[in-house]
């Protein structure tokens, strides 16, 4: 799915606009998978281009929900980095997290709670590292457990 997505994003605006029917989408997808060496009849792709249409079209509001998943993932990776930068999973750090985030529930703005916890705004770089879109050298990012190489991949 990721390689196919990259092929779509490599198209010019005019090239993408010309792929304007389901048949053309299917033909482009088939050609792209073949060009990538991934067209294998015995193993069809799990995710097709049109599987994500609901995320980005229509009045459903799902795109906002999808964005919130990404935002949550970013907060997860940033808070992991905070723990690593501050001595790991210690009792004091756990108490600090409980006092500044968990115990507040819905009584405060979540951005304010996070700033109270981390003493800074969240940084997207840790999510980019976890997704393989940046390497750890950016701004001396700390080693984040749970990255693919930690899982033997």
Pin down the residues of each PLM region.
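C-terminal, non-catalytic "cap/extension" segments appended to globular domains
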Residues: 1-153
């Amino acid at each position: 799915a990721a390689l196919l997505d990259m092929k779509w994003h490599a198209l010019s605006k005019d090239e993408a606009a010309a792929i304007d029917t389901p048949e053309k989408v299917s033909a482009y997808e088939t050609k792209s998978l073949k060009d990538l060496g991934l067209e294998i009849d015995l193993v069809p792709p799990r995710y097709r281009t049109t599987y994500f249409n609901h995320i980005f079209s229509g009045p459903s509001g799902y795109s906002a929900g999808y964005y919130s998943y990404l935002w949550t993932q970013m907060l997860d990776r940033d808070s992991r980095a905070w723990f690593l930068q501050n001595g790991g999973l210690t009792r004091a750090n756990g108490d600090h997290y409980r006092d500044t985030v968990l115990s507040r529930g819905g009584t405060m703005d979540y951005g304010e709670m996070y700033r109270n916890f981390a003493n800074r705004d969240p940084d997207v770089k840790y999510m980019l590292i976890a997704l393989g879109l940046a390497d750890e050298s950016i701004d001396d990012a700390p080693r984040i457990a749970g990255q693919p190489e930690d899982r033997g991949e």
